[in-house]
Amino acid sequence: MKFTNCREPLFLFLFAVLVTTLFSTCSFLYPLNPWDDANVYMTIGNAMLGGKELYVDIFDHKGPVLYLMHEMAAVLSRNSFVGIYLIEIICVFCFMRYSLRTMRLFSTSKATLPLACLLGWVTASSDLFYYGDSVEEFSLPILAHSLYFMLRFARNRQVPSRWQALVMGVGVGLIFWTKFNILFFYVGGIAALALIAWRHSQMKELGQTVLWVIAGWAVTTAAVLSYFAIHGTIEALMESYFMVNIFQYHGTATNGEPDFWWFPLMKLGIWAVLTIPVCLVRARWEVKALLLGTYGVLLLSFATMTVQFYYFLLMYTFAPMLIYLFRNLKPSLRTYVTIGLVGFAAAATNWNLVTLINGTFPKSVLEMAEIINADKSDDSEVLTFSSYDTGIYQHTRHLPPNKNFFISSILDPEIKKEQAEWVESGKVKYLVREIGAIVTCHEYYDAPIPENYRCIYDKEELFRYRLITTPHKFLWNLTYPRVLLRYVMEPVTVNQRMLIYRREP
């Protein structure tokens, strides 16, 4: 099949629509996004649209770009993730597009287009994609774009144009003001590029490119700082984003996995795990240096934090390098390998689609919202008490009543104190609580329900559902011996308990 320059991007875009629709719970196929983090982002976006000041009237520790994006999404729909769904489609498309360009740096095979589609499918269907709407997902196309131009320089000594470098810098700025520790990718990359440029007497060209990248970063930074300067909240930005993340946020109260050395092996997936060994065997030294710099430093950066498994979605940035496998296959074998990979991708279905099909998708929040929405009184304020955001604010007419409207992974006694004061003040009629899925038994979350609140809703439901019938999950599970027998014997479910407490006269 021949594709013109116009048809190929259109094909990739339509494929991005397909995989995003199937696997992201932000799409119209799903009644809601049950992930706590995504609900926090959307709640803050709604609150900002409703007039609350970020980091002053409402708080979470991520960067402002993430919440500004969700504020824009809230303009389209306050009660759904349709705006985020559209952004996800663009992100998946850009990721596939630049992954395809990366593969074509190393191969002229016609297999590059189906492989790019295959990569898009496997990435979106991966457990690492989670429910959709993660910082890592939005960073993936930016990293793929940067890796393409870095590899083009490493392989062909071709520097980006000023415009290309400026766009790359804007992407760096977006990441910087969303989750700055992802920038370790660029730290290793710049070090490797400097070595390559020095060996090939191109330090001047590289220096000029870096200056244009910095200029792009400055454009994004100026836009962000201007927004907060207009609102008079720059000090709150610096305190809440930089100081909190550097000195307070450690994720110790969540289900993060501290065992750094084996955890990546379990969750990276076949694509990313095979990438670096293949490249180290087949690639020239410049490509090896760049991949070791970007991949290695980014991976090592995870050792500085408590690791959530979906952080490793970033490693799919390097999966296009598997084109080396196809370069060295006999033409007669490429067709069979492609067919096998297509079969593998078809089996690689994450739990979102599985639960939607079998009717176990978690949606008790909709029932909870129906109960609260039936209360037409003026004193029906809602607070997610001593737990993460359940998504209740998206499905009711309410905005969070206070700054710390949920309990995060920041173990700050002041957050608990503020919640307790709001409850004691009598201003909150409904307390919504989630137990079991994300929050561990850490004592920080063990806050007693006041005696004047009565439970009016209590339901346990599925939060996560894992199958062992798909090849990639079975191989991942082999690296997790403590639960191997349980995975092999039966599907593993992770349940959550959803509760509503109402204040009694």
Label every model-predicted segment:
Residues 144-167, 201, 271-287, 327:
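Membrane-interface transmembrane helices that cradle and orient dolichyl/undecaprenyl
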Residues 96-123, 140-141, 157-159, 163:
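Transmembrane-helix signature of polytopic, membrane-embedded enzymes
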Residues 357-442:
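Short periplasmic/luminal acceptor-recognition loop of GT-C membrane glycosyltransferases, typified by
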Residues 128-138, 308-309:
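Short acidic/glycine- and proline-prone juxtamembrane loop motifs at membrane-interface regions
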Residues 162-182, 186-191, 219, 295-303:
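Membrane-interface alpha helices of multi-pass inner-membrane proteins
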Residues 97, 266-299, 319-322:
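Hydrophobic, aromatic-rich transmembrane alpha-helices
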Residues 86-107, 145, 149:
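Transmembrane-helix motifs of polytopic, lipid-linked glycan transferases
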Residues 184, 300-334:
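Hydrophobic/aromatic-rich transmembrane helices and adjacent perimembrane loops
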